[in-house]
Curated annotation (Swiss-Prot):
Lineage: Eukaryota, Fungi, Dikarya, Ascomycota, Pezizomycotina
Organism listed in the record: Aspergillus niger
Broad enzyme group: hydrolase
Listed name of the protein: Arabinan endo-1,5-alpha-L-arabinosidase A
Residues of the active site: D34 (proton acceptor), E200 (proton donor)
Signal peptide annotation: 1-19
SUPFAM superfamilies attached to this UniProt entry: Arabinanase/levansucrase/invertase
One Pfam family recorded for the sequence: Glyco_hydro_43
Length: 321
C-alpha cells in the first residue's frame, strides 16, 4: 500500500467494464482496507483483519456478515522500532500448528524504511495476541524492494513469504520451519518495468497443478483528493506457475518478471479500484477472491473502502470472477 499522487487534474471515473459479478453481500461493519480473512477452526467464526487502528478486526458467523467490531489486534502498536509502528498495514492471516499467525507491515507512505512483523494467538479473541516483532524481513533505501504487504504460503514442505511494493515489486523469501523468521535471502517473482512499477499486495494460492500469484496494480489510495486517470486506479492481476518459487507467466505466456499479468478484476459498475486482495478456500463456497474497493455510491476516501468478495471459477485454468 504505497500512495502516489496522480498527475490528473480532473476526476475521471474508470470506464465501465462488463462481465464481472457484483461483490457478494456484506452487512454490519463492512469498511476495510487490505483485508485478511480466515475462519476459526473451533467454531467456524469468520475473522476479517484490516489496515489501520493497529490492525482492526471484525468477526461474523458468515462471510456475508453481519460483521461486528472486535477491536485492535495490537492496541499498543508493534515493538518494531520504525516510524509507523503504531499504524500497521496489510495483515495476512494463516493457521499454523494450532496458532493463528498475522503478519503485518510497519512503514510510512513512500518510504523503504519498512519491516514485516508477526503476531500470534490461539483464539483470535481480543487481548489474546502476542507480538513477536520483526521476522527479519526488512528494507531501507539501500534495498531494491520495499518490505511490506506480506503473504504466507506453505508449499512442498516449505513456508514462504511473498512481499513487496513498487521499486522492484514482488519478492519471495523462504521461512524457517516454524515461520517466525526468514531462513535465507529473497528473490524476485514479479516486476513491471514500466512507469512507477506499480505492483504490490501479492497473494499466492494453489489450485490444482498451479500456483497463482495474485497482486494489485495501479494507484491504491487518495482518490478523494486526486483521482487517477481511467485505468490507473487499483486493479487485480494474476500470473501462474507449476512452481511456488518462480517462472510465473500470464495467460499470453509473458513472464511476470517482465510486465506480464492477466486481469482478474477491475473497476466496473459501482465498484472502483478493487485491490488489496487475498484468496480463501471457503468450505461452503469454494475459492473466494476477497478485496477492498470503493463503492461509488458511498465515497472515494480511504476510510470509505468496502469489503468485497466473489467466488472464483478456475475451470479455464485461470481465475474468473
Amino acid at each position: 500500500m504505497y500512495q502516489l499522487l496522480s498527475v490528473a487534474s480532473v476526476p475521471l471515473l474508470a470506464s465501465l467494464v462488463h462481465g464481472y459479478a457484483d461483490p457478494g453481500a456484506c452487512s454490519g461493519v463492512c469498511t476495510t482496507h487490505d483485508p485478511g480473512l480466515i475462519r476459526r477452526e473451533s467454531d467456524g467464526t469468520y475473522f476479517l483483519f484490516s489496515t489501520g487502528n493497529k490492525i482492526s478486526y471484525v468477526s461474523a458467523s458468515s462471510i456475508e456478515g453481519p460483521w461486528t467490531s472486535v477491536g485492535s489486534m495490537l492496541p499498543d502498536g508493534s515493538s518494531i522500532d520504525l516510524d509507523g509502528n503504531d499504524d500497521l498495514w496489510a495483515p495476512d492471516v494463516s493457521y499454523v500448528d494450532g496458532l493463528y499467525y498475522v503478519y503485518y507491515a510497519v512503514s510510512t507512505f513512500g518510504s523503504q524504511d519498512s519491516a514485516i512483523g508477526l503476531a500470534t494467538s490461539e483464539t483470535m479473541e481480543y487481548g489474546s495476541w502476542t507480538d513477536h516483532g520483526s521476522t527479519g524481513i526488512a528494507s531501507s533505501s539501500a534495498k531494491i524492494y520495499n518490505a511490506i504487504d506480506p503473504n504466507l504460503i506453505y508449499a512442498d514442505g516449505t513456508y514462504y513469504i511473498n512481499f513487496g511494493s513498487f521499486w522492484d515489486d514482488i519478492y519471495q523469501v523462504p521461512m524457517k520451519s516454524t515461520p517466525t523468521a526468514a531462513a535465507s535471502s529473497s528473490y524476485n517473482l514479479a516486476y513491471d518495468p514500466s512507469g512507477t512499477h506499480a505492483e504490490e499486495g501479492s497473494y499466492m494460492f494453489q489450485y490444482g497443478d498451479y500456483y497463482y500469484l495474485f497482486y494489485s496494480a495501479g494507484i491504491c489510495c487518495g482518490y478523494d483528493t486526486s483521482m487517477p486517470a481511467s485505468g490507473e486506479e487499483y486493479h487485480i492481476k494474476v500470473c501462474r506457475s507449476t512452481s511456488p518459487t518462480g517462472d510465473f507467466v500470464d495467460s499470453d505466456g509473458t513472464a511476470c518478471t517482465d510486465g506480464g499479468g492477466t486481469m482478474v478484476l477491475e473497476s466496473h459498475g459501482e465498484v472502483y479500484g478493487p485491490g488489496g486482495q487475498g484468496v480463501y478456500d471457503d468450505p461452503n463456497l469454494g475459492p473466494v477472491l476477497y478485496y477492498h474497493y470503493m463503492n461509488t455510491t458511498i465515497g472515494y476516501a480511504d476510510s470509505d473502502a468496502q469489503f468485497g468478495w466473489n467466488t472464483i471459477d478456475f475451470s479455464s485454468g485461470w481465475p474468473v470472477v
